[in-house]
From Swiss-Prot:
Record keywords, A-Z: NADP, Oxidoreductase
GO molecular function, one term: aldose reductase (NADPH) activity
Catalytic site: Y54
Gene designation: alrB
Listed name of the protein: Aldose reductase B
The reaction(s) this protein catalyses: an alditol + NAD(+) = an aldose + NADH + H(+); an alditol + NADP(+) = an aldose + NADPH + H(+)
One Pfam short name: Aldo_ket_red
Entry annotated with the keyword NADP: yes
Lineage of producing organism: Eukaryota, Amoebozoa, Evosea, Eumycetozoa, Dictyostelia
Protein's organism: Dictyostelium discoideum (Social amoeba)
Binding annotation for substrate: H116
Similarity-based family: Belongs to the aldo/keto reductase family.
Xref: InterPro entries: AKR, Aldo/ket_reductase_CS, NADP_OxRdtase_dom, NADP_OxRdtase_dom_sf
Amino acid sequence: MSQPQNTFKLNDDIHHIPMIGLGTYNGAKVGEVGDAVKVALKSGYRHIDGAAIYMNEKEIGHALKEVFAEGEIKREDIFYVSKLWNSCHHASLVRKHCEKTLEDLGLEYLDLYLIHWPIAFENADPSGTTTQPLRDSDGEPVLAAVSIRETWQEMEKLVEYGLVKSIGVSNFNVQNLVDLLTYAKIKPAINQVEVHPYLSQPNLKYFCDRYGIVLTAYSPLGQGKCDLLSNETLKSIADKHNKTVANVIFKWLNQRGIVTIPKSSNPARIIENFNIFDFQLSNEDMDKINSLNSNLRTCTPANFCKIPLFD
């Protein structure tokens, strides 16, 4: 991948991740995510964040094929991220599901592959061909006797095989990372977690900085479940810079050294969200935004299991 200006260097000192990308979680309509990817890439984005469990990587693959066929944007210009789902942690399944993702996308390699959550479920299919978990009589996923160490060792092999350039994790807390760093031959390049002004994650950020792990912020606007966009402090800062509140939040993240991956299917908003490289927030602006933290989570595992990972 060529190195665009607005990137963060990863801890291998070779690869760089663009500061802002397009999130692709939960496209409601067929074609919606593919159209969003095309708009984003043609508007300057070079970072697309996906996952097998989003069930739309074939659609993204078709969009990438169309864009590449036009000739102006090449595969090496794009930083594509995908994730290994919880029911695919067994050593025998990691490569299989990475290759399935590559097949769906029509790509030969991933720029970054993440363990989606620090929890393993048994696979519903004995041959492990699905992302669906085996469920108990209460409908809850059955936990698998698979350690993060076992899964991480297989992730490291994906780098050796040339299937992925970098590997990382998602939704890992400090304790998860401390354990991982004791045995990792390849350190995680990224930890992707929820970060926004109401959940600023200063302690996790400090730890990740200390060990060379870049944070990526998902749900930077709180998934629309809180009043970030109408917050008076954020609105006043946005007015001062003649920017949107979303622009201010994304800039606040980037100035903290955090990648952000806002999701939108609205073409105008996709373009507007990228408009963060022509202004700077002052120290006073940053302090005001930092003061909004209330440790409010909008994303928990409750939508797929009853395990309180963040308690």
